[in-house]
Amino acid sequence: MSGLQPPAMDKYLRREMDAAAREFYRRLGDGQLAATRCDRCERATFPPRARCPTCGEPQGWVELPRSGRLHAFTSQESALRFAAPAVLALAEVADVVLPGIADGPYEALLIGQAVRIELRPEPDTGLTLLAFVPDG
């Protein structure tokens, strides 16, 4: 993947993140998939937030399962960072929808399909990305 990233994308990926996003990526780097959750509303949120968007209370962290269902996907033929084509996807995991890369042929993917979630380190950015692998 070296050399495929335009300078503008590098600047975007390395920009200063808020504390909740930094904590999310730190946890991913430690092998934990987590989201923020309001104890009062009992609602998990992603992207992670310091305060609940519904009631404004501070949020804590909850670990998410490593399985979910494919919510949406699309093929990006001119990928900015990935070997083209990349299959960008959203997966429903517990109460949240997470972004990632679908791992499998586009033609074999189905909305609602069960997926397991793998954490994949990205050496160019130092971040860990989510990969959705069809389960079964």
Regions found by a protein language model. Give the residues of each.
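Well-ordered alpha/beta subsegment
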Residues: Q5, D95-G136
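Short functional micro-motifs and their immediate structural scaffolds
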Residues: F46, P58-W61
